[in-house]
């Protein structure tokens, strides 16, 4: 196998106009591969550390020149000569160099950039697609796209508390048809909003961001859009939410729709919402440290709804193991930059799957044209991907990559569809 001959790092811009890290890895057989690192807006307290410069005179303190320098000065020389196929050894070497539990010395953005670029280079050198290189011969399942078509919370300048209102086209026969139906509902929603004189400006992830009287009003608008687009709600298309509850949790209470609520009251709200709407998945319904609340909600509705831990788990195997042991949540959101290396991400997915937890591959609100997570979704067979609305190049780049993968797989391709949500039963 080809060995690492050179590594180049640079500062580029993400979809929010903030700097992020891009890395190129060159091998001795002439292969060159590139990877860019995403960045979140609502971040969990237990995520690996994304290193920012803090120099207010440069990119308002958000520069990543230090992370780039760490790659050039502390990582490059240590990895020259490694076989690119030795992903686990390479990732472990970077963790050893860093020497911290949260990657605060080198920066998770530095480590991840190198980790992903190495994997891409190894795949290219082996003349394999990334999903086939990582997933082997059984990588054939196309994920359900969880399209965030109405944005609130930290992703939008609106009064809507819930961060993401998503549609999942579970009734489509193929990924291509799922993407088409999602795009048609997205455009229908814009028409519905305009007809009601509601704002059609976009949030960070390409979804519309109107001010609304209640969070349930968002679901009513999307339901109208689904019908307008000619689809059946609950059968063709279902709902999913990312509440990001940590964002409105303080001093033991949740400030939701203008009122202070307990974990029990929030759980009751979600139960009623699930009774009224075809919701298959709720992400981060409670705060990242409210373990007892998570246990109660999972026991209450976990048999019929996917309860997803994002800030709760931060793609960290140790926190996922605790969630499994304590029956808190029944699914894991997977974000490569939360844990900060490819092998740790794959370990997290493996741990979740072995425990019967579902996994949802996810982007971040600050994205680039990098399509790695599309390949990862197929490689891991997770059956679900969350990468924003079917709009804006940073979002559709992932959807378009999945179209290419489905086309390449041809008759071997399978679309996850309703099978991705075994707990959900349509009315």
UniProtKB/Swiss-Prot annotation:
One of its GO terms (molecular function) is phosphopyruvate hydratase activity. It is found in: Cytoplasm; Secreted; Cell surface. This is Enolase. Belongs to the enolase family. One of its GO terms (biological process) is glycolytic process. Its cofactor is Mg(2+). Binds a second Mg(2+) ion via substrate during catalysis. It comes from Salinispora arenicola (strain CNS-205). Mg(2+) binds at residues 242, 283, 310. The active site is at 205 (proton donor), 335 (proton acceptor). SUPFAM superfamilies: Enolase C-terminal domain-like (SSF51604), Enolase N-terminal domain-like (SSF54826). InterPro entries: Enolase, Enolase-like_C_sf, Enolase-like_N, Enolase_C, Enolase_CS, Enolase_N. It catalyses: (2R)-2-phosphoglycerate = phosphoenolpyruvate + H2O. Gene3D superfamilies: Enolase-like C-terminal domain, Enolase-like, N-terminal domain. Catalyzes the reversible conversion of 2-phosphoglycerate (2-PG) into phosphoenolpyruvate (PEP). It is essential for the degradation of carbohydrates via glycolysis. One of its GO terms (cellular component) is phosphopyruvate hydratase complex. It is an enzyme of class 4 (lyase). Pathway: Carbohydrate degradation; glycolysis; pyruvate from D-glyceraldehyde 3-phosphate: step 4/5. Its EC number is 4.2.1.11. NCBIfam families: eno. Keywords: Cytoplasm, Glycolysis, Lyase, Magnesium, Metal-binding, Secreted. (2R)-2-phosphoglycerate binds at residues 163, 335, 364-365, 386.
């Amino acid at each position: 196998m080809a060995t690492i001959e050179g590594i180049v790092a640079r500062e580029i811009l993400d979809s929010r106009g903030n700097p992020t890290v891009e890395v190129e890895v060159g091998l001795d057989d002439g292969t060159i591969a590139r990877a860019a690192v995403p960045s979140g807006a609502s971040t969990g307290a237990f995520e690996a550390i994304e290193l920012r410069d803090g120099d207010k005179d440069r990119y308002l303190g958000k520069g990543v020149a230090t992370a780039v320098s760490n790659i050039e000065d502390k990582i490059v020389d240590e990895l020259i000569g490694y076989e690119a196929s030795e992903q686990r050894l390479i990732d472990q070497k970077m963790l050893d160099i860093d020497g911290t539990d949260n990657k605060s010395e080198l920066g998770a953005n530095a480590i991840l950039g190198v980790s992903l670029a190495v994997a891409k280079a190894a795949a290219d050198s082996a003349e394999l697609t990334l999903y086939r290189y990582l997933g082997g011969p059984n990588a054939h399942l196309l994920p359900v796209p969880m399209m965030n078509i109405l944005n609130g919370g930290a992703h939008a300048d609106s009064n809507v508390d819930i961060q993401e209102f998503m549609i999942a086209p579970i009734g489509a026969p193929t990924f291509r048809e799922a993407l088409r139906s999602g795009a048609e509902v997205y455009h229908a929603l814009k028409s519905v909003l305009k007809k009601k004189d509601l704002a059609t400006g976009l949030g960070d992830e390409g979804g519309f961001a109107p001010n609304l009287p209640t969070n349930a009003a968002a679901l009513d608008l999307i339901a109208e859009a689904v019908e307008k687009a000619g689809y059946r709600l609950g059968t063709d298309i279902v709902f999913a939410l990312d509440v990001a509850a940590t964002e409105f949790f303080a001093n033991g209470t949740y400030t939701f729709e203008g009122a202070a609520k307990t974990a029990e009251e929030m759980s009751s709200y979600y139960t009623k919402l699930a009774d009224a709407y075809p919701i298959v998945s709720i992400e981060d319904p409670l705060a990242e440290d409210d373990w007892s609340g998570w246990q109660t909600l999972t026991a209450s509705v976990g048999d019929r709804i996917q309860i997803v831990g994002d800030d709760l788990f931060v793609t960290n195997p140790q926190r996922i193991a605790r969630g499994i042991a304590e029956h808190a949540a029944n699914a894991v959101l997977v974000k490569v930059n939360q844990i900060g290396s490819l092998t740790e991400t794959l370990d997290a997915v493996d741990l979740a799957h072995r425990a019967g937890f579902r996994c949802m591959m996810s982007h971040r609100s600050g994205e680039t044209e990098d399509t790695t997570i599309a390949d990862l979704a197929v490689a891991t067979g997770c059956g679900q991907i969350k990468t924003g609305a079917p709009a804006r190049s940073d979002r559709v780049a992932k959807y378009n990559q999945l179209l290419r993968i489905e086309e390449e797989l041809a008759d071997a391709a399978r679309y996850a569809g309703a099978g991705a949500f075994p707990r959900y039963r349509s009315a």
